Protein backbone atom coordinates (compact mmCIF):
# COMPACT_ATOMS: atom_id res chain seq x y z
CA UNK A 1 0.00 0.00 0.00
CA UNK A 2 0.96 3.66 -0.02
CA UNK A 3 2.56 3.65 3.45
CA UNK A 4 4.65 0.52 3.00
CA UNK A 5 5.70 1.77 -0.43
CA UNK A 6 7.17 4.93 1.09
CA UNK A 7 8.72 2.94 3.94
CA UNK A 8 10.60 0.93 1.33
CA UNK A 9 11.80 4.10 -0.40
CA UNK A 10 9.39 3.93 -3.32
CA UNK A 11 6.86 6.21 -4.95
CA UNK A 12 3.42 5.43 -6.38
CA UNK A 13 3.08 5.79 -10.14
CA UNK A 14 0.15 5.00 -12.46
CA UNK A 15 0.26 2.12 -14.93
CA UNK A 16 3.94 1.18 -14.89
CA UNK A 17 7.40 2.15 -13.72
CA UNK A 18 9.68 4.11 -16.06
CA UNK A 19 12.78 2.44 -17.45
CA UNK A 20 15.18 3.56 -14.73
CA UNK A 21 12.94 2.28 -11.93
CA UNK A 22 11.85 -1.15 -10.73
CA UNK A 23 8.48 -2.21 -9.36
CA UNK A 24 8.58 -3.22 -5.71
CA UNK A 25 4.82 -3.52 -5.14
CA UNK A 26 1.45 -1.93 -5.74
CA UNK A 27 -0.20 1.07 -4.11
CA UNK A 28 -3.95 1.60 -4.15
CA UNK A 29 -5.11 -0.59 -7.01
CA UNK A 30 -3.12 -3.10 -9.08
CA UNK A 31 -2.72 -0.50 -11.84
CA UNK A 32 -0.91 1.88 -9.49
CA UNK A 33 2.62 0.60 -9.04
CA UNK A 34 5.11 1.22 -6.29
CA UNK A 35 8.37 2.07 -8.04
CA UNK A 36 11.90 2.59 -6.78
CA UNK A 37 15.13 3.67 -8.43
CA UNK A 38 17.78 1.02 -9.02
From Swiss-Prot:
Lineage, highest ranks first: Eukaryota, Metazoa, Chordata, Craniata, Vertebrata
Major location category of this protein: secreted
Organism, as annotated: Bos taurus (Bovine)
Location of this chain's protein in the cell: Secreted; Membrane
Gene label: DEFB1
Disulfide bonds: 5-34, 12-27, 17-35
Tissue: Neutrophilic granules.
Protein name, entry field: Beta-defensin 1
GO cellular component: extracellular space; membrane; microvesicle; sperm midpiece
Function: Has bactericidal activity. Active against E.coli ML35 but not against S.aureus 502A. May act as a ligand for C-C chemokine receptor CCR6. Positively regulates the sperm motility and bactericidal activity in a CCR6-dependent manner. Binds to CCR6 and triggers Ca2+ mobilization in the sperm which is important for its motility.
Amino acid sequence: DFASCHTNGGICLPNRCPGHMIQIGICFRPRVKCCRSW
